[in-house]
């Protein structure tokens, strides 16, 4: 019997040394009156900043953080989706890594815990962040409470209104939660003056959180896109490799959804670095067509342009995403490392619309009994398509996907979408 402690890795994995070409470095905009790179030193915990710029392949996980990981249910389970296989009549074997098993219901806690730990080690008492659908905000709220810190969360307005239970759980963990754009920041007030009914976006909420942290000398915790986040999330893929080895399986296809890229990177990068798996498929929203219509160029990760420019696939920092149910995918860009891997042809991409992903989610729910987050349902749609393709070609492939979170706090969204699918809405 293998112990949980033996499956949970002792090191985070950093893909940067194993990329096919050097990652274009962050930079300041030409003629800038202040350095965005220097700004990071004012808002990020020191160890988080160090890990953001490291080129070491492996970073030791502090024992305190490993203990916290074990306490929240890591390693998370790897399940075989046998009933889904039977429903699709596919010879493929389908497995999913279930990050919804954590207390906060998603993968986000994997980086919230170490970032909060490093902040507390510095004597920080208050942390700030943004959240889209609420998964990241929930993770930060819990991690902050673990280390007796206060937290402030700027939640994208459309999700704040669509997902009141997400808001409630953050408040239960002790967080102050605000609908972004707000009147608390100069940038938020500027947006509201232009459009008082602005639905908000992750880029705007990120800008507000950074400004608020700077103004109050708090620390900002980052939820996606930056390299340090994908580093921490590598526990997902490393656990999955070990769990597949224990089953005697080798993955052929690895699939995950993409908002900024943290769950996909955390899941697939250990496979890519170890040359395991043959195909890697990143799945995003057709309503926010960053892969099909985005440009690979230097752009700001946040809408106000407070963070350094990074080279990534982007729809532009001023892009306003439509108010889709998968709030965690409402982001204009793709993590720089994932952007590079996509441009180099190592990672494939897919984009699906809401109807397509909710149809796939319904099939998954009926057969596996787990309600996926709308974001994760994008990955499920790609899994269904790949399984059907395997059936057509009679290929006994092993398909593994990351089910990044549960949708039990998104049931009102499911109800609305089911009415539309049934022609009643």
UniProtKB/Swiss-Prot annotation:
GO MF term list: L-serine hydro-lyase (adding indole, L-tryptophan-forming) activity; pyridoxal phosphate binding; tryptophan synthase activity
InterPro entries: Trp_synth_b-like, Trp_synth_b_CS, Trp_synth_beta, Trp_synth_beta/beta-like, TrpB-like_PALP, TrpB-like_PALP_sf
UniProt source species: Saccharolobus solfataricus (strain ATCC 35092 / DSM 1617 / JCM 11322 / P2) (Sulfolobus solfataricus)
CDD domains noted in UniProt: Trp-synth_B
Hydrolase in keyword set: no
Organism superkingdom: Archaea
N6-(pyridoxal phosphate)lysine: residues bearing it: 108
Reactions accelerated catalytically: (1S,2R)-1-C-(indol-3-yl)glycerol 3-phosphate + L-serine = D-glyceraldehyde 3-phosphate + L-tryptophan + H2O
Coiled-coil spans in chain: none
EC top class, as a word: lyase
Enzyme Commission number(s) from the entry: 4.2.1.20
Cofactor(s) in the UniProt record: pyridoxal 5'-phosphate
NCBIfam families tied to this protein: PRK12391.1, trpB_rel
GO biological process terms on file: L-tryptophan biosynthetic process
Signal peptide positions on this chain: none
Protein name, UniProt field: Tryptophan synthase beta chain 1
Database matches in Pfam families: PALP
Keyword DNA-binding applies: no
Subunit structure: Tetramer of two alpha and two beta chains.
UniProt keyword list: Amino-acid biosynthesis, Aromatic amino acid biosynthesis, Lyase, Pyridoxal phosphate, Tryptophan biosynthesis
